């Protein structure tokens, strides 16, 4: 567990197995997490951007804030769920093989992609419908530039269900 810390540059956290919890931590630049088997929970954490890779395990972000509006973030989960609650993410790419993706009162700002092989997407986005352009692509596709905040959800429509709601 990492708690009540300040990291001035990049935080690189790598585990072969086991759960990782990070609480009340400020990371100046990149938050890089890799875990082969185990859950990762980040609560009340801020960073510039993120790179997270989990083979077997779930990712929970609560009060997680990315501050770099220009940098892209990548989240790759092979077998596990992703849950974001009251978080702010910028230009994020989520790639899930097996598992569900959900948010509660979370802002996905900039250009975002959610690619699912098997699982459900349940987005409760911070803001209102007019703040976002949410698109669904069950084949190759892209979003237009009609909104600053774009979310492209892609996957096989026979095995991926998606719902989107908003919280102001």
Predicted regions and their residues:
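Intrinsically disordered, low-complexity terminal regions
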Residues: 1-168
């Amino acid at each position: 567990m990492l708690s009540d810390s300040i990291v001035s540059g990049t935080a690189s956290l790598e585990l072969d197995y086991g759960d990782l919890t990070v609480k009340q931590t400020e990371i100046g630049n990149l938050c890089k997490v890799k875990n082969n088997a185990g859950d990762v929970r980040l609560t009340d954490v801020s960073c510039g951007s993120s790179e997270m890779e989990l083979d077997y395990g779930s990712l929970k972000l609560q009060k997680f804030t990315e501050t770099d509006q220009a940098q892209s973030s990548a989240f790759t989960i092979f077998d596990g769920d992703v849950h974001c609650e009251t978080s702010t993410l910028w230009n994020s790419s989520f790639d899930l093989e097996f598992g569900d993706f959900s948010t509660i009162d979370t802002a996905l700002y900039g250009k975002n992609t959610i690619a699912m092989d098997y699982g459900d997407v349940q987005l409760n986005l911070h803001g209102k419908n007019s703040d976002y352009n949410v698109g669904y692509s069950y084949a190759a596709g892209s979003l237009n530039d009609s909104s600053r905040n774009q979310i492209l959800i892609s996957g096989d429509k026979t095995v991926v269900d998606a719902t989107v709601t908003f919280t102001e």
